[in-house]
Amino acid sequence: VTGTGVCHALRENGHRAILVDLFLGLEEVPADLETLFDAPDGLCPDAKIEVEAPDLETVKRGRKDQGPSHIGPHVLDICQKADLVFLGLHGMDGEDGRIQAALDLLGVPYTGAGHLASAVAMDKAVSKQILDACGIPTPKWRLLSYGLDEAEPLAQTLPMPCVIKTIGGGSSLGVYLPEDRAELKRALEEVLRYGAKVLAEERIYGRELTVAVLGDRWLPAVETVPAGKEFDYVAKYQAGAAVETCPADVPPAVMQAAGELALRTHRALGLEVYSRTDMILDKDGKLW
């Protein structure tokens, strides 16, 4: 959906843009790849977000080539024909520096942060170590690994309620908000499906703000109020599942502080071009 929106916007502004799925790629392409950029529809299908989180195994079965590569047929060949690759990707392989590194090795320019900063920002444990070192306020946290037998005894020492999340997830996938010990065990069982390392965080209650950084300046904060209890995958992508207010209805001093915090985070993690920092404004007026 992100890529489709970007592609349509670029084409409406006169650019020769096409949409290529990183994993599925294109099974059949013309001998002259540059002619793809003249496709009348930009190769953009009608895109929608399903109510349920994507089933990765089903997605994998959708590609004829069942090999181990995470990059679909002809993707890199097409990228090498482009003047610029606009990365509209989320999660593993898209935001974690892998595709960025591949494009760097091919000498293909792309949007967003480079491979190292992308990898650092995607790894929540590494990024939180950097934020702590830079004095940027972040909830108390603990890294739990490897497997339920090892993680559960450590988790039982955590104050409740807390936040349990995979260290490398995106789009609010792999994030759980257990309220008690029974929910904590179930959360660990679920989150360990995403990988062997689990991040446990102190739960901070308050208003959810998001601040984007573009270049070297921050943009007005956006406040998100989910229709349900939490801002999960559905609330993030389904129309009507959350109310987003921009600019957020906060005092000027809070807006300034949120912007400065986002810019500090952007610089601390070595990000470039653009980024987005999510934060909580607690009842005492502190930003996390």
What do the PLM-derived regions correspond to, one by one?
Residues 176-260, 281-288:
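Phosphate-binding site of ATP-dependent enzymes
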Residues 111, 139-140, 219, 275, ...:
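A short, local hydrophobic-aromatic micro-motif
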Residues 1-8, 75-79, 118-207, 260:
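Active-site nucleotide/adenylate-binding loops and adjacent lid/helix of ATP-dependent enzymes
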Residues 277-279:
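Hydrophobic residue at the +6 position relative to the catalytic HRD Asp in the kinase catalytic loop
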